[in-house]
């Protein structure tokens, strides 16, 4: 009996433990409950095949999906004070930052990169909701400003993929100051007459919506994205009225003139490429599989 207890049972437990399915192998659709294999979801740009629901996409995957051949050069971002207010609520802010950096592998919520999009140089910034809800703090603000300045210096369009819960409360007024700073940087880009295109992803709210996320020359959103200042539940509790169906969703805002277009993620790259070439007055690329028309002799 001791032999069975001491040798056989541990071996059986070890064998079964090795065969356990990892927790992230299957992803559940928030709308329909459909289970999707994680590799199939990644191959489909994190769009649920049956429902079309757009899952969140991290910054690096977004950059790779947008630039030609997934190739880009990341822009070095300015360093900022880590925790100037020495903020603490239930936990120290510095500890929350460390956890977010360990979880995502990023220094903060915004990444900026340069590269080619449909053979045209562009500068792109991506806000990652996975890093403390994509909140806007000093580091994120500096990143957006640096991206806008890089676009102005290089003479490229600037594309902003926004995703945020708003200003980072742990940084107080220093966080709120990023709203006018980014707005001023947008104006500087406009003076160079280079386009600023915003892609609103789910969700984009709070101080980000009240600043750079709604100041694009062209405003695009992904299907079903929640876009607004305060959330719908907060508004309903304040005005004590039921909001219309789909209120603050991308389609509702498009119908009411707040957006220029709602674009499926599968068409996003081509749409952005066409817009950039049009606004930069670059010649249109020939359709895929078709050779350019030969010049007359």
UniProtKB/Swiss-Prot annotation:
Name of the protein in its database record: Acetyl-coenzyme A carboxylase carboxyl transferase subunit beta
Protein species of origin: Xanthobacter autotrophicus (strain ATCC BAA-1158 / Py2)
Catalytic activity, reaction form: N(6)-carboxybiotinyl-L-lysyl-[protein] + acetyl-CoA = N(6)-biotinyl-L-lysyl-[protein] + malonyl-CoA
Annotated EC: 2.1.3.15
Lineage: Bacteria, Pseudomonadati, Pseudomonadota, Alphaproteobacteria, Hyphomicrobiales
Top-level enzyme category: transferase
Family listed: Belongs to the AccD/PCCB family.
GO MF: acetyl-CoA carboxylase activity; ATP binding; carboxyl- or carbamoyltransferase activity
GO CC, alphabetical: acetate CoA-transferase complex
Gene3D superfamilies in the record: 2-enoyl-CoA Hydratase, Chain A, domain 1
């Amino acid at each position: 009996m001791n032999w069975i207890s001491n040798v056989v049972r541990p071996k059986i437990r070890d064998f079964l433990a090795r065969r356990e399915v990892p927790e992230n192998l299957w992803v559940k659709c928030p709308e329909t409950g459909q289970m999707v294999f994680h590799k199939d979801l990644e191959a489909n740009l994190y769009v649920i095949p049956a429902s079309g629901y757009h899952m969140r996409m991290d910054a690096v995957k977004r950059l790779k999906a947008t630039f030609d051949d997934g190739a880009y050069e990341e822009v070095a971002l300015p360093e900022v004070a880590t925790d100037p207010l020495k903020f603490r609520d239930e936990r120290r802010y510095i500890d929350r930052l460390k956890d977010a950096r360990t979880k995502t592998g990023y220094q903060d919520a915004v990444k900026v990169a340069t590269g080619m999009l449909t053979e045209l140089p562009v500068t792109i910034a991506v806000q990652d909701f996975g890093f403390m809800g994509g909140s806007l703090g000093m580091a994120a603000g500096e990143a957006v400003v640096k991206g806008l300045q890089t676009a102005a210096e290089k003479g490229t369009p600037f594309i902003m993929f926004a995703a945020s819960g708003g200003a980072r409360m742990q940084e107080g007024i220093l966080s709120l100051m990023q709203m006018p700073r980014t707005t001023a940087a947008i104006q500087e880009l406009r003076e160079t007459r280079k386009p600023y295109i915003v892609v609103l992803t789910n969700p984009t709210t709070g101080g980000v919506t009240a600043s750079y996320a709604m100041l694009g020359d062209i405003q695009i959103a992904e299907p079903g994205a929640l876009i607004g200042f305060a959330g719908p539940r907060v508004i309903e509790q304040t005005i004590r009225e039921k909001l219309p169906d789909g209120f603050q969703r991308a389609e509702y805002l498009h119908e009411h003139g707040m957006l220029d277009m709602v674009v499926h993620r599968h068409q996003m790259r081509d749409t952005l490429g066409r817009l950039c070439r049009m606004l930069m007055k670059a010649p249109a690329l020939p359709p895929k599989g078709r050779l350019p028309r030969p010049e007359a002799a």
